């Protein structure tokens, strides 16, 4: 995501709602299968829509400096800000005062699919907030320092997103083996060991063949891809054999 666009503020404004929408889809999966995370899914839907409206405001109001910004009209920006305030505040007020959803008691352990998807949601939300903060910080700094300007460049975003991307990829490979409610530890650990050995051998082969061409980021990308692919294939073959 940060390759060709160099973490442009306008592109970040589109990236943040995408991250929140991905978290929402995973949260709805838990809500559909286990009837939990209901309130959290509702909040995520409000926040994802709010981030979309906020991105529209940032792009069209002219307060962001970007070659990708367009329709720089302050009056139009105020109109979009009014729409943003009306729908987002209205949605939050309705959620707070009209929410009659009762908490549903449901057991799930730390090695369950529910907990894995909860971690997924937390990581995606923290990542979205971190990117939004880096995008808006120059505006906040300028507002509180009498017009002094500062820029937040690619080093900040790469420092933030790289560990999150690696962690999300690793957790995605592990989450493939998790079951609803609880997972049998011995079966889970056994499959994970087989996958880890396979990926380790594949990593050695890639290092031997492409050592001069692979930079660290590309290597980790290939590693995570192979990790998820191996888990998917093992799960697919286990279903077919069953």
In which residue ranges do the predicted regions lie?
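Contiguous transmembrane helix-bundle modules in multi-pass membrane proteins
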Residues: 9-16, 66-242
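Hydrophobic, small-residue-rich alpha-helical packing segments that form membrane-like cores
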Residues: 1-59, 65-68, 72-84
């Amino acid at each position: 995501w940060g390759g060709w666009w160099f973490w442009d503020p306008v592109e970040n404004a589109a990236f943040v709602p995408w991250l929140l929408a991905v978290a929402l889809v995973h949260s709805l999966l838990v809500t559909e299968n286990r009837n939990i995370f209901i309130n959290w899914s509702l909040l995520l839907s409000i926040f994802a829509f709010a981030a979309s409206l906020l991105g529209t405001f940032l792009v069209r109001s002219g307060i962001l400096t970007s070659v990708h910004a367009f329709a720089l009209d302050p009056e139009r920006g105020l109109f979009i800000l009014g729409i943003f305030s009306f729908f987002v505040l209205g949605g939050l007020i309705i959620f707070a005062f009209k929410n009659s959803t009762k908490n549903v008691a449901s057991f799930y352990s730390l090695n369950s699919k529910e907990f894995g998807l909860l971690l997924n949601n937390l990581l995606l939300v923290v990542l979205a907030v971190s990117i939004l903060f880096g995008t808006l910080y120059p505006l906040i700094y300028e507002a509180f320092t009498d017009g002094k300007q500062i820029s937040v460049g690619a080093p900040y975003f790469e420092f933030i997103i790289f560990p999150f991307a690696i962690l999300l990829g690793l957790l995605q490979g592990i989450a493939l083996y998790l079951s609803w409610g609880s997972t049998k530890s011995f079966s889970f650990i056994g499959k994970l060991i087989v996958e880890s050995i396979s990926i380790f051998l594949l990593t050695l082969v890639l290092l031997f063949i492409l050592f001069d061409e692979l930079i660290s980021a590309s290597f980790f990308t290939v590693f995570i891809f192979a990790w998820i692919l191996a888990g998917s294939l093992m799960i697919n073959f286990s279903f077919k054999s069953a």
